Amino acid sequence: MKKAILIVSFGTTYTETRIKNITAIKNQVSMLYPDTIIEEAVSSRIVRNHMKQDEHIDAKSPLEALMSLKEQGVTGVVVFPTHVIDGIENNQMKNAVEQCRTFFEKIVTADALLSNVDDYTDVSKALWESLKEIAGDSPLIFMGHGTEHSADESYMIIEQALRAYARHPVYIATVEGKRTIQDVIRQMKDEGTVSYTHLRAHETL
């Protein structure tokens, strides 16, 4: 069986961020599976268009990447999403997998990062242990992408899990979800965590 791993990310328009995160993941997977074809796909159409226009990079969609693997004679595929939640992008990826299922002898898909109760606990522990020294006594705010999908509730759940584990004022705001940074600022004022609206980013995640 000719095998491949397809790494699917939302993508980013920031080259440095892409190299530090998405490319780093690909490199690590390549080291672990040196005899396996490693393919990449970008699930966001907007990001793909930006990469093509500004960087002259023809990033593949999940469907295009799967078709490419078929043309290469691949018969077994592991689809590895880096999506945090099982929202719109992850579901579109899964739809692409279903469209191509008959093209391969075997194709399996990993879950998004936050898919079950244990995931929230594990991610909360990892985040807090890596950032508690930076946070110190200050409240810690995470910014997520957010979505209109019902999976947007995942951000509230991970906030609750973080607070329970860290015993620290932790907040999660989103760019496109229900809970905005303005909502978080109001909550911080109500809780007496902060009396001003000037926020300083310690680290970009």
Regions found by a protein language model. Name each.
Residues 1-196:
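Extended amphipathic ligand-handling, pore-lining, and cofactor/metal-binding catalytic surfaces
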Residues 199:
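Flexible, D/E/H-enriched segments
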Residues 202-205:
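Single conserved hydrophobic/aromatic residue that forms the stacking wall/gate
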